[in-house]
């Protein structure tokens, strides 16, 4: 099915708009995946707020121009599906990693967080990045720990004094 020039321009604009607002992109080869499996991947992506699209590589290269993913051009070879993380940098990598466990035909070929392209060996590292809420929770726990230790230390001095007085009273 041939796409006309207007359709190609619309695809490039749509992908460019998404790429401009995305935190990260994960690119995977989907050769050999059945339609039902690809539909399941898209459904999971929608539930997680990840934009997934199959685009011709030449159109994707043009769509990435002027975005933070401009350097992805050399990695775009073969039938590829693109996953754009809009909320958490590791979301699309996590989705593709989990899906590739069930379906071995999905092979991550490249990923990018901002400027810089990474190979598939970095998939585990990117997929393990915390979400915004998880990162904030860890940060708050880090801030809270020294304060709680200080309060316990300050509280320990009077209670130790009271225990000493009680021991002296019991001794007499």
UniProtKB/Swiss-Prot annotation:
Pfam families to which the protein is assigned, alphabetical: Ribosomal_L10 (PF00466)
Keyword Membrane among record annotations: no
Annotated GO biological process: translation
GO MF terms held by the record: large ribosomal subunit rRNA binding
UniProt keywords, alphabetically: Ribonucleoprotein, Ribosomal protein, RNA-binding, rRNA-binding
Gene Ontology terms: cellular component: ribonucleoprotein complex; ribosome
Superkingdom, natural source: Bacteria
Family named by the database record: Belongs to the universal ribosomal protein uL10 family.
Protein name in the entry: Large ribosomal subunit protein uL10
Source organism per UniProt: Idiomarina loihiensis (strain ATCC BAA-735 / DSM 15497 / L2-TR)
